[in-house]
Amino acid sequence: MMGSHIDTVKNAGALDGCYGVLAGLAVARAFRQAGIRPQRSITIGAFTNEEGIRYQPDMMGSLVYARGLSVDAALNTVGIDGTRLGDELARIGYAG
């Protein structure tokens, strides 16, 4: 697995976290262009909610991936503004 997080805070570093995601994509592309077929599957992760500003706990995306939190529990999390994460993901077209 390769990847990182994509920031969810307003004044984060310009490319903080995105470098890891882009590096994973670059490796996969380089392998493909060179005709290299890895012995194992490559997974590229682009996790969200690393900081946990609006929805707790922090690092929620990677926590769900590692099975430390169920998808249902994450989607039913209520944020500091009273919104439910699953509803907000649907609202912005990120559900599913």
Segments and roles (model prediction):
Residues 49, 57-89:
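A glycine-rich helix N-cap at a beta->alpha junction
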Residues 2-5, 11-50:
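Alpha-helical metal-binding/catalytic segments enriched in His/Glu/Asp
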Residues 10-11, 50-56, 96:
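Short, well-ordered, mixed-charge alpha-helical segments that flank or form enzyme active sites
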Residues 13, 18-19, 23, 63-64, ...:
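Solvent-exposed, flexible loop/coil residues
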Residues 30-36, 70-74, 87-95:
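Generic secondary-structure signature for well-ordered alpha-helical cores
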Residues 1-10, 81-96:
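Soluble metallo-hydrolase cores and metallopeptidase-like ectodomains found primarily
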